[in-house]
Every structure is written in C-alpha cells, then in structure tokens.
C-alpha cells in the first residue's frame, strides 16, 4: 500500500510578442508595430496517486488510482490551457487539465498464469474557465478511455512466454465553455 504526491512548476514561455496594427496618416494606410514583453509566467500543479499490491505463491493483485494535473512530463494525459490574458502585455495565466485514471491487474498461478487487466481514464477538464481554445498537452480532446485485457503466460526460471489481448476504446469530447 502506498501513496504519492507530485508537484511540478513549469514556465511555458519567457516573452510575449505580437504586432499591433495602426493607421499611419502619413501613408494613409495601416502599419504594424511590433511589441515584445518579458513575461514571468508559471503553472504549478499537484497530482496524487494511491496504489496497492498483494502477492503470494499463486496470486498477484495490483491496483492504482491517479488524480493528475498536467502529467504530460510523465507521459500521462493532460496539459494546460489559458485562463487569463493581460490586455497590455499579453502575459498569460494558465489552468491545468485534470485527469483521473485507475487500473486493476489480477494474475493467478505459478507455471501457467492467466491474468486480467482493466483500466479507466476520465478527463475532468479545468477548474477555471478558458479564454482561448489553444490547449497544450496530450489527449486534451479525450473524454474517457477504457482498456481491458486478458493474458496467459507460461513461466519457467528466467523465461516467460505468453499471449495477450488488449482492447482499448476512447471517447472524444469537445471544448465546452
């Protein structure tokens, strides 16, 4: 039995650049004025996990549940979006995309070991309203994911042979306001 907490703090960018279009009376046309500001942007998130494992001579049972925020650095689902943009400097504030995922793995036997695996992941969205549809991350348009698998392995000292079948289904969503 165990649990963990992960904190990550990222600087998505260090400067903000854009062009402002304005009327030029000398040419009677439109000109672009470039702007660049140094910005001090940061997104800091916390993620939590709990896991259990039981083993004896014939059984292996393992399970894990994660409530994750912006877990892309760990090859997980999630990311972040923009919750505020400063009108003058274009400095941005961010909010994490949160995912919940859980899985269970059960294996029985010694030489011949049948096993099953089931998993579920759900996009919980952001806790703050987004001001832009631009998202940064992995699986940001995923609503939920279900995985189920069965395996059969033959085990001898230093060798393991087996077959496994896994079915995964994904449901995709859209950005809601």
Language model segments and positions:
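Detector for outer-membrane/organellar transmembrane beta-barrel domains
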Residues: 1-141
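Membrane-embedded beta-strands of outer-membrane beta-barrel proteins
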Residues: 48-50, 102-104, 148-150, 161, ...
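Generic structural signal for beta-strand residues in well-ordered domains
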Residues: 107, 152-154
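Claisen-condensing/thiolase-fold acyl-transfer catalytic domains that form or cleave C-C bonds
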Residues: 145
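Predominantly the C-terminal beta-signal and adjacent terminal strand-loop region
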Residues: 154-177
